[in-house]
Amino acid sequence: SQDRVVFLIKNRHSHKIVGAVGRALNKNDYPKWYMYGNKDVPFKCGECNDAVIVEDCPSACAVSNVLTGIAIMGTKLKALHKSHLQPYKNLYICLDRDATTKAYDMAKDLRSSGFDNIIVKPLEDDLKYYDTEQVRRMFYE
């Protein structure tokens, strides 16, 4: 049996649960991440005017006191994800350090889709390890 922490994914309008993401607690369990339900709806944490696109749920939660975290569960931005990005004043992209090139490609794709408020923030360490003050400094100083 596998122990997992589960993050619920809700519909942005009805707030009904449409999916979930399970993260294995034991690093030897595979798959590390498992998605249930609608795999095209991103996980969102926070209610701020600015948002940051991240790879995973813990990173989205880590920024939620400062920005809205939007986890796309990897590095591929799907067409449906874009519709979830419309309400935000500024959009930041913070993918893991090994995906910096993909972050810049994602920004280019979003700009070609009509988003003009895109800022890529390359990371030294994974956002899930940042505290609220570190997040605030990273994005607003």
What are the roles of these predicted feature ranges?
Residues S1-N90:
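Phosphate-handling DNA/RNA-contact segment within nucleic-acid enzymes
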